[in-house]
Amino acid sequence: MKLAILSRNSKLYSTRRLVEVARMRGHTVRILDPLRCYMRIVVGDFSMHYKGKPIDGYHAVIPRIGVSVTHYAAAVLRQFELMGTYSPNPSDAILRSRDKLRAHQLLAAQGIDMPMTVFGDNPDDTQDLLSMLGPPPHVVKLNEGAQGKGVILSEKNSASRGLVEALRGLYANFLVQEFISEADSADLRCFVVGNQVVATMRRQAAEGDFRSNLHLGGSATAATASEEEQEVAVRSAHALGLTVAGVDLIRSRRGPLVLEVNPTPGLEGIEATSGTNVAIKIVRHVEEMLATICSSNICKP
């Protein structure tokens, strides 16, 4: 298999692990910085260049796309798709999952529960918007944030109004959600590959914080997701069109609630905590999907 990995940094743990495993399994692998890819769009002739040279013939591409380059990198990934290259996470699925509002709407439409969420635009509606949500504490989130950045806990209604007004003044898109106190500032990261959860870890927020992200000082321990939690995680990934995803859940009195579905979840924390070789499961999944596609006589490269 000729495999491309879209990544801005070849030294990142997740990128290195995927390259290592793919080469160990006999595949030809190249890391491509999506911002150095550029394309020509012509009816019947989609092409791509990288650092001055044409690139084609890739059987599969694994996207490791950061939030800051989502839209351009998704366009690059879409061009690969139009050239007949398979991706476990298609460009449209990445765009769906990176837009928290859109993702929440799609998940709710599939009957997947999450913290109650409100969204609005006009300052005149702020008080009624918060009334729809219920009493504080409230969680205010930037719509396209990541790794816990842009997530604020507001313990008073007046503080929530102030935050909403400040974010509107910055022309930032945001959501406001109910705070689930019984989650005890912890969540589960369920790593979905294909039709199953292949690894799980429990993340606990650092003392004095409520965000459990490891990048913000949270700690992680090995965990086992219940059958219900695994089912919710897989359904959530598939509802957005993803086959590789990190699904973040919290445990509540009404069952598992989805916080976020990450289309490019990091491998370092989950592999170290769970002891599972997640990278090889991703590469094997790509191999299996390509075998299915090629057996259907639609394998183009």
UniProtKB/Swiss-Prot annotation:
Pfam family, one: RimK
Residues annotated as binding Mg(2+) 2: E260, N262
Co-factor remark: Binds 2 magnesium or manganese ions per subunit.
GO BP, one annotated term: protein modification process
Keywords linked to the UniProt accession: ATP-binding, Ligase, Magnesium, Manganese, Metal-binding, Nucleotide-binding, Protein biosynthesis
Enzyme category, top tier: ligase
Domain of life: Bacteria
Residues involved in ATP binding: K141, E178, F179, D187, R211, S212, N213
A GO CC term attached to the entry: cytoplasm
Positions bound to Mn(2+) 1: D248, E260
Enzyme Commission number(s) from the entry: 6.3.2.-
Residues bound to Mn(2+) 2: E260, N262
Cofactor(s) listed in the protein's UniProt record: Mg(2+); Mn(2+)
Positions contributing to Mg(2+) 1 binding: D248, E260
Family: Belongs to the RimK family.
Protein name from the UniProt record: Probable alpha-L-glutamate ligase
Species for this entry: Xylella fastidiosa (strain Temecula1 / ATCC 700964)
Lineage, opening ranks: Bacteria, Pseudomonadati, Pseudomonadota, Gammaproteobacteria, Lysobacterales
